[in-house]
């Protein structure tokens, strides 16, 4: 997924590209689950943001400023499916244990993909059972 996003970033020639939900399109339900967030931005946009931001929040979370500003060229990559209720980030010990279970499902194929996780019934059951927001 990351390779595809980098390719899109270069192809689109944007300042910022992401697969997270577009803040200007809040009704959109086609975005990736937590844990698969990718944000790519140019050095130029980062330096420009640094000069323009004034809040400590924006210093800490610079992409929030880039996403909400009209001065940058942005592109949001949508998913083909609705994943908004699924969470696959590792924020707690329980999350880590659940991700370990998913890795065990794919023990014979260490090169599994994002799509493989959501096509496989066992891994999808783990996610749905324990990682629903």
State the predicted function of each range.
Residues 90:
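A C-terminal functional module that forms or caps the active site or interfaces directly
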């Amino acid at each position: 997924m990351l390779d595809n996003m980098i390719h899109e970033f270069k192809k689109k020639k944007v300042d910022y590209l992401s697969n997270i939900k577009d803040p200007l399109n809040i009704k959109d339900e086609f975005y990736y689950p937590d844990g698969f967030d990718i944000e790519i931005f140019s050095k130029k946009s980062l330096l420009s943001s640094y000069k323009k931001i004034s809040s400590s929040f924006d210093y800490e979370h610079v992409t929030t400023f880039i996403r909400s500003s009209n001065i940058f060229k942005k592109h949001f990559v949508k998913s083909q499916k609705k994943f908004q209720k699924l969470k696959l980030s590792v924020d707690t010990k329980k999350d880590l244990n659940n991700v370990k279970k998913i890795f065990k499902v794919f023990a014979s194929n260490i090169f599994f993909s994002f799509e493989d996780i959501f096509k496989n019934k066992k891994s999808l059951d783990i996610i749905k059972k324990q990682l629903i927001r």
